[in-house]
Design a protein with these regions (language model features):
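Short, basic (Lys/Arg/His-rich) helix/loop patches that form interaction surfaces
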Residues: 70, 124, 128-129, 201, ...
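Conserved tyrosine-mediated DNA breakage-rejoining catalytic core shared by Y-recombinases
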Residues: 103, 117-118, 151-216, 220
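Short, structural beta-strand-to-alpha-helix junction motif
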Residues: 6-11, 47-49, 152
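Basic, Lys/Arg- and aromatic-enriched nucleic-acid-binding interface segment
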Residues: 68, 73-76, 89, 93-95, ...
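Basic/aromatic DNA-contact patch characteristic of tyrosine site-specific recombinases
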Residues: 1-6, 10, 60, 198, ...
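N-terminal core-binding DNA-recognition domain of tyrosine site-specific recombinases/integrases
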Residues: 4, 16-92, 108, 243-248, ...
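Catalytic-site neighborhood detector that most strongly recognizes the C-terminal catalytic loop/helix
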Residues: 105, 109, 169, 273, ...
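Short, polar N-cap/turn motifs at the start of nucleic acid-interacting alpha helices
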Residues: 155-162, 245, 264, 283-296
């Protein structure tokens, strides 16, 4: 069989499992698997040989995909663009029609940011919550959720009042071949998101104080005969030292907001407590609320 006689559907499945998946992270593979097996392939009313692929065929396919959910068009076109680039690179086709297809812009994410007064209410409530330290790390240091979960006590320099960001925790999923079905899930350590994500940050005293309190609490847990503690040195962990579920912090934030009549805010929203409306320049939490001694 000639390369150009290969069917698009067959190629996409082979490409995703054998070419694309080995070069991406597992979380990216999960999104890709959903896009291919739940959006693109079911929307192919008629399969087509690679040599007959055209702008018109792809536009019609993506139009059907886009009707499934708001982000489907964007994610479908994104995955097909990567696949078709490999199709052309491997000489299955001499011309790649994807760049000429109709674009489906990514919807701008809506990050809910609490105003100054609501943030004060939120912070007062958070100060009485077991997640207080994690919330402070998001608000004061602008850390991502995975970075917060990946922090270890060895990353903090109490003398210099700094923290080193050098890892994150992410979900590691194994999917059943040719399906969007999770067969195995674990939380594992990974390098930070980008090279620029490796950094050393100054940490305010109010945060360092909470880190020290957490450290003392964990030392007590280690000596508790009723707890089989696993010492991974994580700052944010379960009672037995195991990593937290990656959804746990957002769930805790939702409870705090609901109990205090506040709009729900996510961990990502904690990273953006205040933005200048004209320059969009990030302002630290303390430029809004003052020095640490004024915080609960």
């Amino acid at each position: 069989m000639q390369k150009t006689d290969v069917m698009l559907g067959d190629y996409l499945e082979y490409w995703f499992e054998n070419i694309f998946s080995p070069r991406i992270e597992t979380t990216t593979r999960m999104v890709g698997a959903y896009t291919l097996y739940n959006l693109i392939l079911p929307s192919m009313e008629a399969d087509i040989k690679l040599k007959y692929i055209s702008v018109e065929y792809l536009d019609a396919l993506l139009e059907r995909v886009a009707k499934i959910c708001p982000s489907a068009g964007n994610k479908g076109r994104e995955l097909l663009s990567i696949a078709m680039k490999d199709v052309a690179g491997d000489k299955f086709i001499s011309y790649n029609p994807m760049p000429e297809t109709k674009p489906y812009p990514r919807a701008k994410p809506k990050v809910r940011v609490l105003g100054k007064e609501k943030l004060k209410v939120f912070l007062e409530a958070a100060s009485k919550n077991p997640w207080y330290l994690e919330i402070l790390l998001g608000l004061f240091c602008g850390l991502r959720k995975g970075e917060i979960f990946g922090l270890k006590f060895q990353d903090f320099d109490f003398e210099k009042q700094t923290v080193r960001i050098s890892r994150q925790l992410v979900g590691n999923l194994k999917l059943k071949e040719k399906e969007f079905t999770v067969t195995e899930y674990a939380v594992i350590e990974r390098n930070p998101k980008t090279e620029n994500s490796y950094r050393i940050l100054r940490v305010q005293k109010v945060v360092m104080r909470e880190v020290k309190r957490r450290q003392q609490l964990i030392e007590l847990r280690k000596t508790d005969p009723g707890i089989e503690y696993k010492n991974f040195d994580y700052v944010c962990c379960q009672e037995n030292g195991e990593p937290r579920s990656l959804t746990a912090m957002n769930q805790a934030l939702t409870k705090i907001c609901n109990r205090n009549g506040l709009p729900n805010i996510t961990v990502h929203g904690l990273r953006h407590p205040y933005v200048k409306p004209t320059t969009k320049k990030f302002i630290t939490f303390f430029e809004v609320f003052g020095q640490p001694h004024s915080c609960p």
